Amino acid sequence: MNLSRFAPSPSSDSLISTLRPRAAVRRLHSNITGPMTPFKTAVNAYVASEGTDNSYVVRPRLYNDKRAQSDGSNALLSSIGPSGTTKRPRDEMDCFTDTHKHKRGDGNKSRRREQCRANQARYRDKQRNAQQQLERSVEQLQSELSTLKHRNLDLASRQRTNQSPWNTVAEVFRLLGVCFRSPWRVTCVQEMRNHSEMRQILAILERSFTHDVAMGDLRGIDALMEQLLQFSQY
């Protein structure tokens, strides 16, 4: 078996191109002391490639420029601590959560206030209705009491008017006769009240007259009975 065809053949001179060295990016430069941040490293690499006169140095393309600036910006933003003005995504999420909780708390407070107002309004209406019902009950009781008083007076008047007028006249003459026979019994009203016959006569006369009986300028049963007692003492 012939293996000569698999042997490597020499390359042509036309396939060899000029080698161009890459621009080295270092963290330390002659004019800058101390370590640099990724942002400064990317920017210095771009500046160094622009300022060289070597035509063999490959200058970065526009895409690489923007990418370097973007990488440097991201590195700068990532290096800012919590005290910086730029907020991290988690801080924004926390802020959004706090705002949502605050709004939800305000909504709950508003609903609670509305519920309290509704409860107070119902309580005031209930108290007002109870007060009005009590006032109506009092007015009804007063009306019934007045009606009962008038009915009582009417019944008493009917009972008195059922007696014969001659019986009343007879009781008056009977009173006068007792007074003439026993004048010491009419010395005072208290003495007259102590005598049983006098009490009976006075009770019959009081039942015979109405409560608004009148005789001359006298009005009422008590005034009339007092006048009769004075007549009996002459």
Curated annotation (Swiss-Prot):
Any one Gene Ontology molecular-function term assigned to this protein's record: DNA binding
Region named Disordered: 67-134
Protein name in UniProt: bZIP transcription factor 1
Annotated family: Belongs to the bZIP family.
Subcellular location: Nucleus
GO cellular component: nucleus
Boundaries of every bZIP domain copy: 106-169
Bias-annotated ranges (Polar residues): 70-86
Compositional bias of kind Basic and acidic residues: 88-128
Function text: Required for normal zoospore movement, formation of appressoria by germinated zoospore cysts and plant infection.
Self-association state and partner proteins as the record states: Interacts with PKZ1.
Annotated region described as Basic motif, given as residue ranges: 109-128
GO biological process, one term: appressorium-mediated entry into host
Keywords recorded for this protein, A-Z: DNA-binding, Nucleus, Transcription, Transcription regulation
Gene: BZP1
Region (Leucine-zipper): 134-155
